[in-house]
């Protein structure tokens, strides 16, 4: 009985995945992960910081890499790094954050407030609307 269930499960998985791949192809030939939803991915490539919307690359000017992305009220917020500074972008406009040798690791939006969590040379911090709030007293915290 267990062998029978195994073979049935394997067949359903094999044929089910093949069917999904052909049914979920959009007009660009892409196979979306979540049908009928917009997929945002933050990262970088050889040209620098960027994000992708459903596979289409959007450049983040002046950035080295992007670490997180969130969409709020139609605006795209992305955290990352530019040179030795943490930064974030609203859509494609870059905002540098105070503190040297830092990186913005995560971003959140609450109403009109933009929060970026990250670190800088002296330890962990977060920035609220561009103002740095230290979370540590030394580099090891």
How would you label these PLM feature ranges?
Residues 2-10:
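Sec-dependent signal peptide recognition
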Residues 14-16:
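C-terminal motif of bacterial Sec signal peptides marking the signal peptidase cleavage site
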Residues 18-21:
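Bacterial signal peptide processing site
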Residues 26-141:
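Residue-level hotspots at or immediately adjacent to binding/recognition sites across diverse folds
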């Amino acid at each position: 009985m267990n062998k029978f269930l195994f073979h049935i499960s394997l067949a359903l998985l094999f044929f089910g995945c093949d069917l999904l791949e052909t049914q979920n192809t959009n007009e660009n030939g892409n196979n979306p992960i979540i049908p009928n939803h917009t997929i945002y991915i933050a990262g970088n490539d050889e040209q620098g910081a960027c994000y992708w919307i459903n596979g289409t690359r959007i450049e983040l000017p002046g950035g080295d890499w992007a670490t997180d992305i969130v969409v709020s009220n139609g605006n795209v917020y992305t955290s990352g790094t530019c040179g030795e500074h943490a930064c974030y972008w609203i859509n494609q406009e870059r905002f540098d954050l105070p503190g040297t040798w830092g990186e913005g690791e995560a971003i959140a939006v609450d109403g009109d407030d933009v929060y970026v969590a990250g670190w800088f040379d002296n330890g962990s911090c977060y920035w609220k609307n561009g103002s740095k709030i230290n979370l540590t007293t030394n580099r090891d915290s």
